[in-house]
Each structure stands twice: as C-alpha cells, then as structure tokens.
Amino acid sequence: MFCLLVIVLLALQSEINAYNISPYPNSVLNFPELEGNRRSSYFGFSLVIREKSIMVAAPRANSSLEAQRNISEPGVIFRCYFESGNNCSPYNIDTKGNYKGMPNDGLLTAKNKDFRWLGGAMDGGTRDSDKFLVCAPRFYSINNENDYNNGMCYWLSDTPKNIDSTEVMEKWPLRIEKKQVLKLADTNLIPYYSMGELGLSAHVSDDNSKLLMGAPGIDQWKGSVHLKQEVPSIKTSSGRQRRGMNTNRKCNECNPEPKNFGQEEFSYFGYAVSSGYFDSSNLSTVLYVATAPRGNNQFGEAYIFDIYEDSIYKYHEFRGNHFGEYFGYSVLAEDLNGDGKTDVIISAPLYALRNSYDDGAIYVFINKGSFTFEERIIRSPAGSGGRFGTTLSRIGDINKDGYNDVAVGAPFAGNGSVFIYLGSENGLRDPPSQCLDAPSQQPSKYGSYMFGHGLSRGSDIDGNGFNDFAIGAPNAEAVYLYRAYPVVKIHAIIKPKLQNVNPEEERVNITVCYRLSSKSDSKAKALMEQELVIRIDIDTKSKIKLAVFDEEHGSQMSFKAKAFHEEICSEFQIEMDKRAKFTPIALEMQYELSKKIPNSGDFCEDCAVVDPAEPKFVTEYITFNTGCATDVCVADLKISCINASSTLVLGTTAVLRLTYNITNNGEFAYHPKFSVTNSAGLSLAQVPGNCKVNEAVMVCDLNHGQRMAKGDTDSLTISFDVRQLRGRSLEIQAEVLSARDESNPENNKLTNVLSLREKADIYVSGVQTNDHVVLKESPYTAEVVNYYEIKSHGPSTLENLTVSLYIPVAYKTPDSTNVKHIVTSSPKIQSKYAHKIMPINFIDQNNALANNFAIDHDQSTLLFSATPQHENVGNLSGIVEQNPSISLLNEDLPVNNTLVLNCQDTNVTLCVPVEIRLENGLQLKPEELMNMTVSFTVNLKDADDIWEYFVIQTDLKVHKIGDPTLSSFTIEKKIESNVICKHAEIAIWKIIVSVIVGILVFSAATYALYKRGFFKRAIKDDLKQLIRDSFEDGIIRTEMEENAQSQGDADLDEKLDAYADTTGKCTHV
C-alpha cells in the first residue's frame, strides 16, 4: 500500500516510476520449520547472496544440532539454492554446544550461546570464493557468575557446498579477563569488554583482505572496532609514506582503545562499519568508515579512518544535523558517480519531517577528492513511521549505465518497502527508480513483515547479465528473490530523402531506421531480438493537416517491427498539400518495446526494458526552398491600431471594437498569426472565423493561413464585451508573429491603454406620504412618513457608493446654548435595492447625539429611541456645509412665526446622519430604483410658542469612494420639506371670564340707551295707524264698487271722488 501511494507521487514527479527489477518477487524462500520455535526466528534478518545460492540468517531460530538442542535460540544460518526448488538447509557455522570453563592464560573460555543472535550481522562478496563473515553480537561468557556480553564472529575463506567445521575461524578478541571490568581511581567499576557486543556490525572488504567488526559497547559504550587484516606494504605513488601514518604500527589483529582516540561515552562507535577507497591521492589503499549514532551529543557522527595497533587515525568526520535522528544507524561505501572514488551514504532512520515521526532519511556524501565531500539529503518517500534507511545495500550497476546503484529499506512502512536509487554522474538520482512493496498487505502471525530489513547485495544469478537481489522479511520468516530484466537502448531516426524540397513537389519520401544496443555482455535472446511499436505523426501541432501518408492512414501511421543489433531501415511516402510547400513539416516518431514485463511474479525470459530516462521519440523536419535570401526567411511584420481611443466612459457601449492593420515589410512571413489579450480578462463579443480563444487569449491566422509576401497587408477587428468592465484602466496587448525570424521584433507588439471613466446622472426625490400635520391641541405630537427614491440614469454603473440621509432632530433657541428636540420618538428607516433589504449605519461624528438617542438597528431597520432633553449647544455640532440661502418652500408661510430646520444651517439645526453603503459587489445600475422609507414622530410640546409653523428639511447626499470631487456623477434633487402647523389652545378660565365680561358690558349699554329714549319709536305708531286707515278705506271702496255694478250706477266715479274728499284720501296711485 505504501509503495502504491509512493508510485503515484513519483509518477507525478517523473516518468521513472518502474524499471528493470521485477515488480513482484520471482521466488520465495520460506523458513524451514524447526522444533522449539515459539516466536519469529527472524529468518531473513540479514542476507549474503552468492552465485547460485543465498545465505540467510535466522538469529532467533533454534538449532537442530544435537549439541545445541538445549540451547535457546542460538540462531541458525541457512543456505538456500536457487536451482533446487529454493530448498533451504542449515549451514552449520558452529556445531558445538555451550562450554563451561575457567579462564585460561588470562582468557575467558566459557561459552554461552543462548540468545546469541548468530547472523545478527553478516557480510561477504557475491562469489563462493569470497570470504564469509557471520557474527553473534549477544554471545556471552560466564565467569564467577558474571555474564560478559563480548560478542563473537565466525569467518570462512570461502563457502563450499559442504562446510568443514575445522575451516571455520572464531573471532573472540574481547575475551581478555582483566579487561572485562576496569576499576577507576575512585574505586568505581566500569564495563570495558564485558558489554562490547562485537559483531553488531560486520564488513568484508572488496578485496577480501580485511574483516571489520563493530563493538559499540566497549569502554562504557564508547565503542570501537576490531580489524583482522593482511598487512600490505603501503606506499604512495611517489614512494613516500602517507601523511600521519606509521607502517611499523600496522597490525594483523587490531583492537583500538577508545581512550586513545578520545571517543565520547555512550556514543556507540562501531554501530555500522564499511570500507572503501576514499583517499584521492592513493586510490589503491583501503580506509574504513564507522558510525557513532549517539556521538556528537546525540546528533550522530561517523569517521573515515585507518587503524594502527591500539588507536585510529581520523581523516574525515561526518556529522548529523538533527538531534536524535540516529545518524549512523547504517552506512554504505560505494562509488556512485563512476569517478573511482568511494562515496558514502549514512542513514538516519529516526529523521522526522514536520508534523511526523520516524520518517527517515539518508545522507549522501559525494567524494570530491582530498577528503572533501558534497552533502545531500534524500528524505523518506515512505511516510511517517517507515524508518527509511534502516538498511542499505550495494546492488551494483543493475541497469548497466556505468553507475552503481543502491537499495534502501523502510521495513516499518506498513509491512515494509524497499526503494531502488540509481547512480549517475551527479550521484544518486532522486526520486527512486522503483519501489518494491511487501507482497502482502496483511500482517503475519508475528506482526508486520519488516520487509526490507534484510537486503542482499546484487548478483546475476540467472546469467542474463543484470544483477538480481533478495529482500528479507524477518517477521514473515521469508526471503523474496527479485530478478532483473535486461536493459536495452533503442536507436531510431527519421529523415526525409531530400533536403530543401522543391515547392512543387507533391510527394516526399522519408526513411525510418532503428536498432538495439546494450552494455551487457550477455548474448541472451532478449537483447538479440525485440519487437518495437513505432508510430509516426505528421505535423501533430498544426491545426491544419498539410501532409498525410494516404487516405487510409491520414497523418498518423503505426506499425510493429523487429529490431536487432544491426540497423534496419524502411521507406514511406508522404503526400503534400499545396499549402505546405513553403512551411516546414514536423515528423515525429515514437517508439517503445512491444512486449511489457508482466505485472506479476512470473519472470518473462525474453522480455527487456528501456531506461525511462532515455528519449522515447525523435523529431525531424521536411524543409522547403523558401524563396528568401537564406534558408531562413526574415520577415518584418508591423502592427498598428487605427481607431484606438485613450478614454472609455463605462456604460456608453456594450462592445469595444478595435481595428488592427498588419503589414509585412520584409521577406516571406510563414504562418503569420495575430494574438490579443487584455488586462481585465474580457471575453470576446465576436470571434472571427479565423481565430480561436483559449483562456482569454485570442489567436488568429493572418492572410487566410497563407504566407505574407513583402507589402502584403491584413486587418482584423476585435470586439470586446465591456458590459462588466470595471476599474481605472484597460490595457490591450496585441502581437503579430510568424514561424520564422523577425528583423524588427519591436514593432511586432502594440499596447493600447484606455483610461476608464464613470459617468452617471442621479435623480433623488423625496415626498411626505401621509397628510400634512396640523397640531391643535396637546400633546402636539404626530408621525411624519417620508419616502425617498434614488435612481441613476446612467450611462455608467456605479460602485462603492454611500447614500447619506440627514434628519433634523433638534434646534438651538436664539441667544441661548440650550437645545430643544422636536424628534423624540424612535425613527424607523428602511431601504431596499435590487430586491434586497439594505443595512443602515448610524453616523454620529462626535458621539454627542448618542447621549439623547438609544440606537437599536438590524440589517433592515434603524431605530433611534429619544427623550427630549435640554443640552448645552457647546457639546453639539451640525453638518458643516455652507449654503448661501434657505427658502421657505413654495407655500406662503409667515416669515416671523415660521422656523425652518435645515441641516446645512449649523447655527440653528442639529441633525442625525445615516448611511447606506453599496458594497460587496452591489452596484447602482442605470434605471434601477433604490428607495428609502423614513418615519419619525415630532413632538412640539416644548417648542417655543412664537413659532406657529415648523419646516423640517431632510437632505440626501451621495458619495463615492475614490471620487472626493464627485466627478463621476451629477445629482438632481427634488425633496419636499415637512411642514408642521401648531395652533395654540385657549384656556377654559379665559373663556368663562370673557363671557361674563361681555354680558356685563352688554347690559350696561342697553340700560343707558333705554334711559336716553333710544328704544321709543313714534314713527312706528304713525305707520301702523296709516296702514290701518288704508285697509279700512279699501274695504269701503270695494263695497261701493260692488254696489254700483249691481245697480248700474254711471256716476260711480263721482261718488268715489266725493267720498275721497270727505275722507281726505287718494283713490288712485
């Protein structure tokens, strides 16, 4: 699982995500069950691979030997042959049991082999003739009931099939009795050899002349090493003795004393050991490297050194960088870059990345000569807890590229993983070329596999010329063998038969050649013959296909072909389009091996692989006679814009059109193209047919895709959608280019910068929506409701606007500092725009008004709770704004008893300002209405009686962020004022007194007139008598006329006249 994740990550970083090691084990060696084992034997803990077999250590196994039946877990070495069904049998290095004996001649003789961990460390070359070194670091001797954990090693000069126990050599250099425990001057006893643990690490030099064993417990865990060697005559190339060295002090059996080279206590020097050719002035001399992971104050250290009798001479020191990372847990010496000098890899498996633990890392030190090293850290790709670098192994040059490769184990990454790193001219390549995961993700009965804790060297066990290697999984009691596939290199070329093809040619022949090579000496079939898959593409990057193979294949042809060591060539014919004869045509040939290695443990005997770092394609061009002075035409394209403006008023147009002219003043311009982009990422309102848009960049073919000769011109009109355009400026960049060189590239580009302006006409209106207020009686309160509208007539859309409303709430009395409040209720303000309730902000510049108004507002309504109070005017200030005059509305109001409250008159009026902000993308768009409803209660109870009319003039202003002069818009206002009429009420007592006084005055006047005879009316009596007499005469005359008519009296008139004379009255009027 870990490797699957790692491979995914590595695939993103590099094409090298698998290589020539089989991805799954090709065979498995399992622990031969022995009697008495109750826990894991750790079969596979350490490995030494040979030509046809592998030595496998099981340091916790019980022995089947009769002499060791009563010994608990002495450890067993197994030899497993690859050609005999992977059968494993004990390779009995030590056939004897425990021995109880007294010291002899000052040397311990008792041997206790219980839990001695035989095979805890092993080393040896890959040939059967190489020496073989096996150690048991927990071997101990008993003397006077004291256990001395000296450690013991065994070595053989070679590994014959049938081992002779007499040929096994024991190495027990720490058996000196008097050095087991030392007494200091203060009588304290310290362990010296008694906890030495010789063989915790083991190493056999490449020339088989030296055996180096680590003993990190010597002298209170200062640590040291033991060296068995054949002493050569060491001279430099000039015949002079090497600096700092005395050949007389060379030893066959060397036990350096830590006190002689100043080793730090508890530093564990000798924890890991190796050797190599580090001295660039003498590359024939072997020097040693050993680590002390708890040295350097637990930062860890390692030394390159030589040994002389009882001390060492240090040539170079390596130091860890992090406390507790266990720098020096493992060490590997190998020439990684092929320069002949041995490089060094030191692991730190407890190295932790941030927010992680025990990730692990390896420090790679590239030898630059004269004991100077270039350091590089490769951090774990295995994740937290994997302990990358627990084991390191030299696997040789597995891909035959001339550089040695290494394997790095991370046995605690799940069930364990192993990473393959390839050498190169610059050291190790990173990332790894391959990751091998434990075959199973399920834990064994003993827990996680610890796959990778055992790593063998590389050895070609199947004879195909490439090194194979084995991986041990101690907790699974198994060893997995991984074989390597041969690596071949594909050599392929593609080329036209003719150079500079004539423009009139309709067909062109091309030649394709290919062959295989390998640096391996093997003559295996996999190298001799491989099938290739070849694909040829014509002009893949061209949008217009200018050449094809034929109607059947089009511009792509694929085929399979056998490849050998010898080069094979084939010819193909390409049909040319007339448009292509002046344009170079790209031919790209891709190739790969047809047969892939199986994604399983089955090994394919006739398969091979190609180094993923090698190219997988080759490109060539068909070129034509250009008709120019040289093979390469030099054009001189020039671009200009004929209708560009320096200013754009936003909203005046939905589409911005720019027309560009392109002229060629040079030689032929092939594939002329025009591209345009803009700083605002505007989309195109229209895309011409010869253009394509990709991520706001439009690219167009000029001259219908044909070449442009000298003097040719073309033009394009580009239409940008500017409906959503915002900002202060717009930069439009246009460029023309061709497939060939340009003589004057400066005029190929043109940048137009347009200054963006906003312009809008805003209309503001306000009216009172309820009836005019007339207050006739106490408490002289009434609600006033105003409605306001704000509308922009454009053309621009405005943003970052603030609408401010000013409401008069109080006034100052003349010649006084007192303030009288006329708005004492809780004004409610609600605003809507674009179907949204707008938030209201109360602004009190000096907090003075807040003393009188308790504020309670939410997203939709603003409330001011007020109580009328008299305040000192010194604490208040109005809106500072000059206004030359204040009119009294359209109504004819008396000036002397009318009070006008206007927020611009700061000497009289005190106002409450509120704000509505259009922010967070909200914009005032043309013809979209914004409204505001304001209601408040006026209270004129405490107003001065001299005022009969109160005029409240609210004001509304608009501001824009970044436009202090309001140059981007104009405002027309029509806001009606609120007029409140107050008629004073007459007191009852005044009415009663007035009535009584009136009655008294009336009575007195009447009596006076009576006394003066005003009420005597003589003329009235005469008129009554006259009326009465007239009425009586009328009756008499009527009777007389009636009588005369009845008697026919002709003298009636005379009788009437006579009657009139007697009465003295008129008979006619």
From Swiss-Prot:
It holds the Pfam family Integrin_A_Ig_2. PROSITE patterns: FG_GAP, INTEGRIN_ALPHA. FG-GAP repeats lie at residues 29-89, 104-165, 184-237, 255-310, 312-374, 375-430, 437-499. InterPro entries: FG-GAP, Int_alpha_beta-p, Integrin_alpha, Integrin_alpha_C_CS, Integrin_alpha_Ig-like_2, Integrin_alpha_N, Integrin_dom_sf. One of its GO terms (cellular component) is membrane. GO terms for biological process: cell adhesion mediated by integrin; cell-cell adhesion; cell-matrix adhesion; heterophilic cell-cell adhesion via plasma membrane cell adhesion molecules; integrin-mediated signaling pathway; oocyte growth. It is found in: Membrane. This is Integrin alpha-PS4. The gene is ItgaPS4.
